[in-house]
Amino acid sequence: MEFKHTSVLLHETIDNLAPQSGGTYVDATFGGGGHARYLLRKLDKGNLIGFDQDQYAIDTAQSNFAAFLKEDSQPRLQLVHNNFSHLKEELAKLGISGIDGIYYDLGVSSPQLDQAERGFSYRFDARLDMRMDQSQDFDAYQLVNQYDQKQLADVLYRYGDEKFSRQIARKIVERRRGKPIETTFELVEIIKEAIPAAARRRGGHPAKKSFQAIRVEVNHELDVLRASLEEAISLLNPGGRISVITFQSLEDKIVKQTFKKYSEVEIPRGMPVVPEGIKPTLRLVNRKSITASEEELAENNRSHSAKLRVAEKL
């Protein structure tokens, strides 16, 4: 099986994790395993637990990483089919209560976008789906056909920053009165009709923001990210690091705010000196986000919007 996906900020993500021999690490978004393979090469001992909610990614990894999965009686890689918001629960099943590092590569993987039947892309005609975990019931078809006009407009504006969210929501509700909206191309046409012609000619594909917003809502991406970051930080051993790659401003804002919250000490009002023993939980490894090099930008278009933030547990 193939899972063709070029990992973004590969060396920056793993090198800043500062992996130590014998450590326990978590890949929260295993995907095609590009980051995992690089980390496993750097670790002569230790183990990696790879999470992915996409069964296709897990099945592919079972084949592509067979050597690491079956290494003697102590496999260096273990795979978990679950969303990364269940870190503590799943790691506890493996007898793990603390980790030395964790990394996230957020967003949709190339295979998910390129598999037309997954319904993620406005480039292919398929049934509206967009579920990262295909065992989940709720999908894009249900969202588009069941949310009321205000709910639709709110989703498009909040998660897609779509300035024509109200017009698009109104057009969706009008169209589905006749029959359900079933496919990606049907939705694309509705979006195009709702956006003024002048606006359609600039800023990329007119459906890009709406499709992002619907995907985020279907998969509860921002809620599960917040929950997962909290669990990850609590699981880190002292000196352990967390690396997070984001591809859109809402994700980056959550990561930045979470790291800021745990890297600062809240001093009670009127207290001039920080009491002894009170210290922050995290240290920011990089004050500003790390972005792709000129070389990577030229080779991988997906890297243009990527931002990496890294923090260390104190």
Curated annotation (Swiss-Prot):
Q: Which UniProt keywords apply?
A: Cytoplasm, Methyltransferase, rRNA processing, S-adenosyl-L-methionine, Transferase
Keyword Cell wall biogenesis/degradation applies: no
Presence of the UniProt keyword rRNA processing in the record: yes
A GO molecular-function annotation: rRNA (cytosine-N4-)-methyltransferase activity
**Matching Gene3D superfamilies, A to Z?**
Putative methyltransferase TM0872, insert domain, Vaccinia Virus protein VP39
Where is this gene product found? Cytoplasm
Reaction(s) the record says it catalyses:
cytidine(1402) in 16S rRNA + S-adenosyl-L-methionine = N(4)-methylcytidine(1402) in 16S rRNA + S-adenosyl-L-homocysteine + H(+)
What does this chain do?
A: Specifically methylates the N4 position of cytidine in position 1402 (C1402) of 16S rRNA.
UniProt name for this protein: Ribosomal RNA small subunit methyltransferase H
The scientific name of the source species is: Lactobacillus delbrueckii subsp. bulgaricus (strain ATCC 11842 / DSM 20081 / BCRC 10696 / JCM 1002 / NBRC 13953 / NCIMB 11778 / NCTC 12712 / WDCM 00102 / Lb 14)
The taxonomic lineage of its organism, from the top, reads:
Bacteria, Bacillati, Bacillota, Bacilli, Lactobacillales
